[in-house]
């Protein structure tokens, strides 16, 4: 009888495994003509990428994922804030010798209210939500990605009062919450059958979450993996994804039991040192403001916060120093109050 229960237990664990190779194989079922690529960056850290026709969504998609084994990866995680002097991700990642990095929370500062998100790093509050509760963007801080201990990450629901009282050193608020305790909430919170959302303000939650666009997500898995995932958009070669579809991708193929949507759009940037001249591996959408047909790795938006993966070991830091990172030739400033 004990053997029977043990067998069931191990079957469940194996089924929920989110190893990089299992993820690659699973997502490849959606890209039969253009299977993904996998590259080991350092111990416990893998970069996965797909570019081509997604046969589930029936659209062209560009997906990049950093899959991190929290138990074995020799990394420190820097919840970097530089919203007082915005920079490109590749500049910040290069100057800190990061092996990889992504943009993180919503950093905009609005003339009609101020900041839309909360940010705390190394125990210091860098940014507080100042927009009023009736503001169309108030929803953007209703969840948070937090680090509680060197290797422990969680995704929580809350508000600024909750975040300020938490005895946690690193917090980035964002929204929407996509998966909570194994429940794929992102599949249900927007009614896709209510018709065209174009009459709503661009940052209204229903329009934001129903629209196909560039998106960043931070999921975690039951087997102690952190995944940083980007899906490009606003191009015929990468047509974007909505919150429901993103939830489905993370839940079924990455086996995530927690996930949060982070800042996307033109801010979406993923950096892998040495992968391209600038380190950027996704296709920043702001470049198409200059060249409508542009589809390459330049045109980063200057952002105000990021999550940096920095090596602990001196030998890896020295290796990072030797990899040259070039300046983005088309870095874009962000307009906080677009018309």
Q: PLM ranges: what are they?
A:
Residues 99-103, 144-147, 153-155, 217-219, ...:
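Structural recognition of the beta-strand scaffold that forms the well-ordered cores
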Residues 312-338:
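Short S/T/G/P-enriched beta-strand
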Residues 111-139, 199-258, 267-319:
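Conserved, well-ordered active-site substructure
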Residues 132, 136-195, 205:
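A substrate-binding/cap region within the structured catalytic cores of diverse enzymes
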Residues 18-156:
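Zymogen propeptides
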Residues 10-19:
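Hydrophobic h-region of N-terminal signal peptides that target proteins for export
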Residues 51, 56, 177-223:
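Conserved beta-alpha junction segments in alpha/beta enzyme cores
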Residues 3-9:
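Sec-dependent signal peptide recognition
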């Amino acid at each position: 009888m004990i053997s029977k229960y043990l067998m069931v237990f191990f079957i469940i664990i194996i089924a929920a495994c989110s190893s990089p190779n299992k993820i690659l194989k699973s997502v490849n079922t959606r890209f039969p003509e253009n299977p993904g690529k996998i590259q080991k960056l350092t111990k416990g850290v893998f970069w996965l990428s797909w570019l081509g026709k997604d046969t589930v969504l029936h659209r062209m998609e560009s997906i990049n994922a950093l899959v991190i084994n929290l138990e074995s990866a020799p990394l420190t995680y820097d919840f970097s804030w530089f919203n007082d002097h915005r920079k490109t991700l590749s500049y910040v990642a290069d100057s800190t010798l990061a092996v990889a990095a992504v943009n993180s929370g919503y950093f905009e500062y609005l003339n009609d209210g101020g900041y839309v998100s909360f940010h705390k790093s190394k125990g210091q509050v860098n940014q507080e939500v100042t927009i009023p509760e009736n503001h169309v963007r108030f929803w953007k801080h209703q969840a948070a990605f937090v680090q509680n201990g060197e290797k422990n990450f969680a995704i929580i629901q809350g508000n600024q009062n909750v975040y300020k009282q938490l005895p946690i050193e690193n917090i980035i608020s964002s929204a929407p919450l996509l998966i909570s305790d194994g429940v794929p909430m992102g599949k249900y919170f927007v009614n896709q059958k209510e018709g065209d959302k174009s009459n709503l303000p661009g940052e209204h939650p229903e329009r934001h979450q129903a629209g196909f666009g560039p998106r960043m997500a931070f999921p975690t898995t039951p087997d102690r993996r952190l995944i940083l995932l980007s899906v490009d958009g606003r191009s015929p070669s990468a047509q974007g994804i909505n919150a429901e579809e993103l939830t489905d991708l993370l839940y079924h193929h990455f086996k995530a039991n927690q996930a949060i949507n982070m800042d996307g759009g033109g801010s979406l940037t993923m950096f892998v040192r040495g992968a391209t001249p600038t380190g950027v591996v996704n296709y920043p959408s702001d470049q198409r403001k200059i060249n409508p047909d542009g589809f390459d790795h330049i045109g980063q938006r200057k952002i105000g916060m990021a999550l940096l993966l920095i090596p602990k070991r001196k030998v890896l830091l020295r290796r990072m120093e030797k990899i040259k990172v070039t300046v983005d030739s088309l870095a874009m400033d962000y307009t906080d109050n677009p018309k």
